[in-house]
A protein has these predicted regions:
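A cross-family acyltransferase "interaction/gating" segment
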Residues: 1-62, 83-101, 109-121
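Short, structured interface segments
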Residues: 60-74
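Metal-cofactor-binding active-site regions of metalloenzymes
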Residues: 105
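Anionic N-terminal interaction surfaces
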Residues: 132-187
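Phosphoinositide-binding peripheral membrane targeting modules
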Residues: 165, 171, 175-225, 237, ...
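Canonical pleckstrin homology
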Residues: 216-265
Length: 265
């Protein structure tokens, strides 16, 4: 990794700041809903000059990743910090893909501090400790992190199957221009090799393929679109027919990229 090469060449000690509580205050999928709580900043030495002089680039990279990795849920459990808000569950409906009780897909709704499955009624409130409080007869994971980890494991298992395929009809915009009109539409498919698009862009037939190897990850807006850079057409935002599938595409693609890169070393 380039950051590890830079650190090795510089040879200077590296300090790191780890922020606790920011995700629980304002998560990237909450659509701006802020919770009142506490944020702590922890300063630590990530690497000394002596360590840098003897570490491999991979060891340097691993040390850097470990120094900035955070787990707000573990921090909350150890610190006991509570969060207040009347929209604690906002955005959850866009990342809870599978119901743990009835296995329905894309069935969750959220309003205020509550989530519920539109298929079986499985429901819970989000408490001040950001853990789920299941309502009568409901079955939910302990918190959002545990739910996402369970889903991610299933997405990865699906992606490892030989016949793996995700497909969706899409509408397309130029990335970064969310208020602009759509510039195209078509079909987006992801298999174990990469992402394929076929459709119309700017009034012309368009087709392209992006190999997982050159795409280290997918970003976008949960519940809405995926961002995919493309050489001929620039950065594009693909709005899936089922926006709640964005997280599924994201985790599957990141796994397939990592698997390809690892196999080459």
């Amino acid at each position: 990794p380039s950051i590890a090469r830079l650190v090795r060449r510089a040879g200077a000690p590296v300090a790191a700041l780890r922020i606790h509580g920011s995700f629980l205050t304002l998560s990237r999928f909450s659509h701006g809903a802020m919770n009142k709580g506490r944020i702590e900043i922890e300063k630590r030495m990530a690497l000394t000059a002596e360590q840098i002089s003897v570490y491999t680039e991979q060891q340097i990279y691993d040390a850097l990743c470990g120094a900035i990795a955070f787990d707000d849920y573990a921090w909350q459990r150890s610190s006991g910090v509570l969060f207040k808000g009347n929209k604690l569950a906002q955005g959850y409906e866009n990342i809870l893909v599978r119901c743990p009780k009835c296995a329905a897909r894309y069935s969750y709704h959220a309003e205020g501090n509550r989530i519920w499955c539109g298929s079986c009624g499985n429901s819970a409130d989000v408490g001040a400790d950001m853990r789920f409080i299941p309502l009568e007869g409901s079955n939910v994971p302990a918190d959002l992190q545990e739910w996402i980890r369970t889903q991610k494991a299933q997405f990865i298992q699906d992606a490892d199957k030989k016949d793996f395929l995700l497909a969706s009809e899409v509408r397309v915009k130029s990335y970064g221009l969310s208020n602009s009109p759509y510039i195209g539409e078509g079909s987006l498919r992801m298999d174990r090799q990469g992402i394929h698009f076929k459709g119309v862009l700017d009034g012309k037939d368009a087709e392209f393929f992006v190999d997982h190897q050159i795409l280290p990850g997918l970003t976008g807006e949960f519940g809405e679109y995926l961002y995919i850079p493309q050489a001929d057409h620039g950065p594009l935002a693909f709005y899936l027919a089922q926006g709640k599938a964005v997280i599924e595409w994201k985790f599957a693609q990141e796994h397939l990229h990592s698997k390809i890169v690892t196999s080459q070393h």
